[in-house]
Swiss-Prot record:
Pfam hit, one: PRAI
InterPro entries: Aldolase_TIM, PRAI_dom, RibuloseP-bd_barrel, TrpF_fam
Protein name: N-(5'-phosphoribosyl)anthranilate isomerase 3, chloroplastic
Native source species: Arabidopsis thaliana
PANTHER family: N-(5'-PHOSPHORIBOSYL)ANTHRANILATE ISOMERASE (PTHR42894:SF1)
C-alpha cells in the first residue's frame, strides 16, 4: 500500500476527469484540471481551462461530477483545505507503522472537519483485528474503514455489519489479483479498491472483474491515462470506477 498523500477520482462511465488541483461540476464543463477527457459515444476529447470557486456545494456532491478521495491527511487544517477543494472522502492512516500515521484524537478532529464540510472520513487499517478497528472507528467517528492486510480483511464479514467498508484487493505488476473478495459477504462491501503498489497497467486482467462487480471500484496505480480509463469504462461497462 502507499502511505503518502493520494487522491482517488470516482468516474461516471460517460464523464472522465483527472485532476491535480481542483474540480467543478461537469454540467458547465468548467475545469481547472491538469487534463480532462469527456467520453460520449466512445469518443474521447481533451481540454484544459481555468476557473475559480469550483468547490461543490454540499447538495451537489456526487451529482454529475467525479467523486474525489484524498488519503494520507494528517491534520484538521489539511482536511479543511481538502474539503474546500471539493474532496468527498478524507482518508487517514490509522496504521501505526506508516510515516503518515495519526493518533485517534487527531483522526477525530479530522473526521469532524470532514463531516462538517459534507465529506466522509475514511480510516486506513493494516493487519488490525476486528476489535481494534471498531474501537478506532468509534473513537474517531469514521464513516468508512479501509482494509489492507490479511488480518484486517479476515474481519470483513463481521466489520461490514457494523461499518461501511472499503475492501482492498492487491494486484502485482502483471495485473494479477493476489486476493479475492469473500464469496459469502463480498456483495456487502461499499467499495472495492484495487491496489497496485508498484503501479502498472492491469486493464486486461481486470475487465472481467469489473464486469461482474456490483460494487463501486477504486483503482490505485501510477500509469493510468485518460485513454486507458476511457477504454476500461467502455469495455467493462462498469457503473463507477475510481483512480488513486
Amino acid at each position: 500500500m502507499s502511505t503518502g498523500i493520494s487522491s482517488d477520482l470516482h468516474l461516471h462511465p460517460r464523464a472522465l476527469n483527472f485532476s491535480k488541483t481542483s474540480k467543478s461540476g461537469l454540467s458547465n464543463r468548467k475545469v481547472s484540471f491538469s487534463s480532462v477527457g469527456y467520453a460520449q459515444n466512445r469518443k474521447l476529447s481533451c481540454s484544459v481551462s481555468s476557473t475559480e470557486n469550483v468547490a461543490p456545494k454540499d447538495d451537489d456532491r456526487g451529482k454529475d461530477r467525479p467523486l474525489v478521495k484524498m488519503c494520507g491527511i494528517t491534520s484538521a487544517r489539511d482536511a479543511a483545505m481538502a474539503v474546500e477543494a471539493g474532496a468527498d472522502f478524507i482518508g487517514m492512516i490509522i496504521w501505526p507503522h506508516s510515516k503518515r500515521s495519526i493518533s485517534l484524537s487527531v483522526a477525530k478532529d479530522i473526521s469532524q472537519v470532514a463531516r462538517e464540510g459534507g465529506a466522509k472520513p475514511v480510516g486506513v487499517f493494516v493487519e488490525d483485528d476486528e476489535n481494534t478497528i471498531l474501537r478506532a472507528a468509534d473513537s474517531s467517528d469514521l464513516e468508512l474503514v479501509q482494509l489492507h492486510g490479511n488480518s484486517s480483511r479476515a474481519a470483513f464479514s463481521r466489520l461490514v455489519r457494523e461499518r461501511k467498508v472499503i475492501y482492498v484487493l492487491n494486484a502485482n505488476e502483471d495485473g494479477k489479483l493476489l486476493n479475492v473478495v469473500p464469496e459469502e459477504d463480498g456483495h456487502l462491501a461499499d467499495w472495492i479498491l484495487v491496489d497496485s503498489a508498484t503501479g502498472g497497467r492491469y486493464l486486461d486482467q481486470l475487465l472481467s472483474f469489473f464486469a461482474l462487480s456490483h460494487c463501486n471500484v477504486f483503482l490505485r496505480g501510477t500509469s493510468y491515462t485518460i485513454t486507458l480509463v476511457h477504454e476500461t469504462v467502455c469495455l467493462s461497462q462498469v457503473t463507477e470506477i475510481s483512480r488513486v
